[in-house]
Amino acid sequence: MSHADLARTIEAAWEDRASVGPTTQGTVREAVEAALALLDSGQARVAEKSGSADWQVNQWLKKAVLLSFRLNDMSVIPGGPGGAAWWDKVPSKFEGWDADRFRAAGFRAVPGAVVRRGSYIAPGAVLMPSFVNLGAYVGEGTMVDTWATIGSCAQVGKNCHISGGAGIAGVLEPLQANPVIIEDNCFIGARAEVAEGVIVGEGSVLSMGVYIGASTKIIDRATGEVMYGRVPPYSVVVSGTQPGKPLPDGTPGPSLYCAVIVKRVDAGTRAKTGINELLRD
């Protein structure tokens, strides 16, 4: 089936999803499995650039992921330490892989890396003990460091560094919600968190512990501009606070968290400058 045919079949199945279950066979199951295979191989993505700055979300692929949970029954997944097993609906991406398959895929996955089937890892990527959920996309040359999480349907570009313990949040529901997107050449600091469909523009640096969701104020220190949901390309971002409103009795109110763009750099500066130097005021 073409992508258009798959999309039509999955959209129709989604409208009648109450009737979809582990016993469902035929075109619905075939379409969902084909969609997951496209995601797993990188031939299709939940979100892709449609222009110089805009991202298009392929909602039918998110629906395929959700339908797969209805289609697939729970099963034992072997391979745990000490002969332990897991109990889940989604097998490992690496189930049945041998050395030739890993060499062909072209990325590194160290012991402790958990990658679910239906996610794509591009050649040259390095996965430390981390978690990559289904529907996610990890670009060429990207490092996913220890205990970092790439959530369901999250999109991470080329040559990024997702530092230890950082969270790139996933999104399956609500259905209309957009995935988190980390564009090419970004650095996400340790224990930082990007959630709720936020887009981090190309070449940006998020310092350790920066949290950005859809309602987080992102303030450009140089201009005073306040923005939401998108970090402009080549921004250097740190955690900050903004004065709160006075309390009813007139005393100062609590300060509120925000993310602060402390500087913007061009591509050449970003390529030549070390991360610590960029973050230094």
Swiss-Prot record:
Top EC class, one word: transferase
GO cellular component, one term: cytoplasm
GO biological process: diaminopimelate biosynthetic process; lysine biosynthetic process via diaminopimelate
Primary residence: cytoplasm
Matching CDD domains: LbH_THP_succinylT
Keywords tagged on the record: Acyltransferase, Amino-acid biosynthesis, Cytoplasm, Diaminopimelate biosynthesis, Lysine biosynthesis, Repeat, Transferase
Cellular localization per UniProt: Cytoplasm
Residues annotated for substrate binding in this entry: 108, 145
One matching Pfam family: THDPS_N_2
Reactions this protein catalyses: (S)-2,3,4,5-tetrahydrodipicolinate + succinyl-CoA + H2O = (S)-2-succinylamino-6-oxoheptanedioate + CoA
Pathway: Amino-acid biosynthesis; L-lysine biosynthesis via DAP pathway; LL-2,6-diaminopimelate from (S)-tetrahydrodipicolinate (succinylase route): step 1/3
InterPro entries xrefs: DapD_Trfase_Hexpep_rpt_fam, Hexapep, THP_succinylTrfase_dom1, THP_succinylTrfase_N_sf, Trimer_LpxA-like_sf
Leader sequence segment: none
EC number(s) reported in the record: 2.3.1.117
Domain of life: Bacteria
GO molecular function annotations of the record: 2,3,4,5-tetrahydropyridine-2,6-dicarboxylate N-succinyltransferase activity; nucleotidyltransferase activity
NCBIfam families, sorted: dapD, PRK11830.1
Subunit note: Homotrimer.
Recorded family membership: Belongs to the transferase hexapeptide repeat family.
Protein name per UniProt: 2,3,4,5-tetrahydropyridine-2,6-dicarboxylate N-succinyltransferase
Gene: dapD
